[in-house]
Amino acid sequence: MAKSKYEYVKQFESHDTLLPQCYIVVRIDGKKFHEFSKYYDFKKPNDERALKLMNACAKNVVLQYRHEMILAYGESDEYSFVLKKDTELYKRRRDKLSTLIVSLFTSNYVALWSKFFPGTNLHPKHLPFFDSRCVIYPNLETIRDYVTWRYVDTHINNLYNTAFWQLIQKCGMNPQEAEKRLSGTVSSEKNEILFKECGINYNNEPEMYKKGSLITNKGEILHINVIDSLDSLFEGY
């Protein structure tokens, strides 16, 4: 193959290879999704269409790399893809893993949009985009704790958001009043506020909202107690 005198510039490229025998998580997050969701009038505190769209995109990513992934877990506008510790996907290059997974997810989001939001076209000035990062975890304990962290975070965020928006929508509070009402409250108190002041039993909220979505490497979308399922989820890995 012919070479030019300018090929020397390739020496300035760097390829960060992730440590071997460590679990890899590629986590994607919606960028400026507060503005995006407001423009497309997402329902608060949860928009079922938007969450199912995220799940469909993540499922396609998992199935594309099912031999390299253990699972994916998502809530709101984020998703975490957990890769096997012995994966050699893209030679474990951080830049490749991060960019290819997030670009595949984003292209699916655009392609599947009309299925979940029929009659609402994406505006060229209001398109979805996501950031992405790769993090490595050295052993089974830390990767289990990572998934647990995201699961617990889902519960904390959803309980707060549910109480916050119900105080606004059902009790007539403005955002500042709702925030003040919830300030300093613990989970049990938020549950009580929802039940006594808003007539909402949090236990009856959809499982997808309360528990997030877990996708197995077979493409199954589950809304389960992740903490109770960790042993089976990571069996053999």
Curated annotation (Swiss-Prot):
It is an enzyme of class 2 (transferase). Keywords: GTP-binding, Magnesium, Metal-binding, Nucleotide-binding, Nucleotidyltransferase, Transferase, tRNA processing. Binds 2 magnesium ions per subunit. GO terms for molecular function: GTP binding; identical protein binding; magnesium ion binding; tRNA guanylyltransferase activity. Mg(2+) 2 binds at D29, D77. InterPro entries: Thg1_C_dom (IPR025845), tRNAHis_GuaTrfase_cat (IPR024956), tRNAHis_GuaTrfase_Thg1 (IPR007537), tRNAHis_GuaTrfase_Thg1_sf (IPR038469). Its cofactor is Mg(2+). Adds a GMP to the 5'-end of tRNA(His) after transcription and RNase P cleavage. This is tRNA(His) guanylyltransferase. It comes from Candida glabrata (strain ATCC 2001 / BCRC 20586 / JCM 3761 / NBRC 0622 / NRRL Y-65 / CBS 138) (Yeast). The lineage of its organism: Eukaryota, Fungi, Dikarya, Ascomycota, Saccharomycotina.
